[in-house]
Amino acid sequence: MPELPEVETVMRGLQPSMEGVVIARADVNRPDLRWPFPDRMTERLSGRRVLSMRRRSKYILADLDSGETLLVHLGMSGRMTVSGDPLGQFVHSHPQLEKHDHVVFHMDNGARVTFNDPRRFGAMDLLETAKADSHKLLAVLGPEPLGNDFHESHLVSAFKGRRTPVKSALLDQGIIAGLGNIYVCEALFRAGISPRREAGKISTSRVTSLVPIIRQVLQDAIAAGGSSLKDFRQANGELGYFQHTFDVYGREGEPCRRAGCTGTVTRITQSGRSSFYCGKCQR
């Protein structure tokens, strides 16, 4: 599933073609994805200008001049890609639509934005912009890890007395929004903390050290265009390449990359998900 860096990468890639631009026509090619599309979705999108775009957790939000906000979740295999030149040249150079191209946005600058989702775990909805943050999917989210509300005192407070493993705590979207399995594994490695350790038993100094480490891991991944393991593509169709720099994720049995450590990467299962870590240098 695309995590925060992948969704941020896609959103940034869509902005030049969509932000400030009118959706000339929206084509919806099936009745649903994870859940049914909103009523009259084509009518409510066509002719509307995208005022601004932003990301919240793993959701892309596009505010429209109608007072509604388009919410998009990529699910497990969803992609949003741009074809055509948004400056107006080669506006007919669009590839033929594919089987799983479920929603197509024809922008009035000549760009075409296509939502492709083979597994159909993605989702779209239209929300009232003024009340978007109180929507049931967004209201339960914790602070953004790249935002000002994510700070040391927040994490110390969230971990206090918590008996769950730190890996599970960091994946709790009510504590931090947008973190996923890959980047939690990578952040815990950089911090030297075992994913098995109870969150509430980690010293305050080690908890506070996690905040800048989490930020840096996410920033590094965004700079690399995200991680492409199976389905993920950037908005221009290119692969991300942060996966080539993973320290632990997907490296079971391989040597630890920490200087001076002679351990190997271990994989365990926690809450149904694989955790990768070095048992020698992560404590």
Curated annotation (Swiss-Prot):
Binding site for DNA: H100, R119, R162
Pfam families listed in its UniProt record: Fapy_DNA_glyco (PF01149), H2TH (PF06831)
Active-site residues (renumbered): P2, E3, K58, R273
Enzyme Commission numbers on file: 3.2.2.23, 4.2.99.18
Domain of life from the UniProt record: Bacteria
Catalytic activity as recorded in UniProt: Hydrolysis of DNA containing ring-opened 7-methylguanine residues, releasing 2,6-diamino-4-hydroxy-5-(N-methyl)formamidopyrimidine; 2'-deoxyribonucleotide-(2'-deoxyribose 5'-phosphate)-2'-deoxyribonucleotide-DNA = a 3'-end 2'-deoxyribonucleotide-(2,3-dehydro-2,3-deoxyribose 5'-phosphate)-DNA + a 5'-end 5'-phospho-2'-deoxyribonucleoside-DNA + H(+)
A GO BP entry: base-excision repair
Gene Ontology molecular functions: 8-oxo-7,8-dihydroguanine DNA N-glycosylase activity; class I DNA-(apurinic or apyrimidinic site) endonuclease activity; damaged DNA binding; zinc ion binding
Cofactor(s), names only, from the UniProt record: Zn(2+)
Keyword list, A-Z: DNA damage, DNA repair, DNA-binding, Glycosidase, Hydrolase, Lyase, Metal-binding, Multifunctional enzyme, Zinc, Zinc-finger
PROSITE patterns the record matches: FPG_CAT, ZF_FPG_2
Zinc finger (FPG-type): 247-283
Free-text comment on the cofactor: Binds 1 zinc ion per subunit.
Function per UniProt: Involved in base excision repair of DNA damaged by oxidation or by mutagenic agents. Acts as a DNA glycosylase that recognizes and removes damaged bases. Has a preference for oxidized purines, such as 7,8-dihydro-8-oxoguanine (8-oxoG). Has AP (apurinic/apyrimidinic) lyase activity and introduces nicks in the DNA strand. Cleaves the DNA backbone by beta-delta elimination to generate a single-strand break at the site of the removed base with both 3'- and 5'-phosphates.
Subunit architecture: Monomer.
Similarity comment: family membership: Belongs to the FPG family.
Official protein name in the record: Formamidopyrimidine-DNA glycosylase
UniProt lineage: Bacteria, Pseudomonadati, Pseudomonadota, Alphaproteobacteria, Rhodobacterales
Name of the gene this protein is made from: mutM
